[in-house]
Amino acid sequence: MRAFVLRARSAPTDSQLFLASVGQEPHTEILAHTLMNTIFVAQSHRNDVVVYLVLESTHDFSRTICFDTRNICHIGGFHEQALLTKIAKALDISRGMTKEQTRVVDEGITVSTISFEKLVQDLAVDYQLFMMDKKGTSIREQEFVGNPCFLLTDHIPMPKKSFNTLKRLGAQKISLGPKMLFASQCVVLIHNELDINQ
């Protein structure tokens, strides 16, 4: 099983603000692009992937939306608008939730009020954690054992204090090459390497 976590530090947890932020400073379209490239293949979707979108621009708690492809039946289409609508629906369903609650959005999709840090702590139990770093081990030289989990960010870099927490949890740095890439591009390269080596 492959897991991907996209930490969207500027993405609003209010559904209307989220939708209004497409193409604006928060760049919420990044979530749809990354989700699209993580889940879908031509004429179908992968059935061995879990994607966590962590939206952090909030007045109360971060929202973590989980897409588990083993259980997803219908997501509304392969296009950006369908994915943005699904994320907005999850945010609407999350209204009024208290800390560390989870609600079902649709088959294979849940929304939780857990932070990025708590999510990664939980994932570290079952997954081998990787964070992107130009100075890390090349993905082509990295050995993947068990279930890999890849930690990505939107256009706002990961805070330095998060790196220390991730290191303590055993996260390893991997490189996809010398260029800084969009999260949506990273997932394509990661999938390709793992597919080739399966």
UniProtKB/Swiss-Prot annotation:
Transcription listed as a keyword: no
CDD domains (alphabetical): TrmY-like
EC number(s) reported in the record: 2.1.1.-
Family: Belongs to the methyltransferase superfamily. TrmY family.
Keyword Methyltransferase: yes
Keywords for this protein: Cytoplasm, Methyltransferase, S-adenosyl-L-methionine, Transferase
Chief subcellular location: cytoplasm
Pfam families per record: Methyltrn_RNA_2
GO molecular function, one term: S-adenosylmethionine-dependent methyltransferase activity
An example Gene Ontology biological process: tRNA methylation
Subcellular location: Cytoplasm
GO terms under cellular component: cytoplasm
Amino acids binding S-adenosyl-L-methionine: 132, 186
Name of the protein described by the UniProt record: Putative pseudouridine methyltransferase
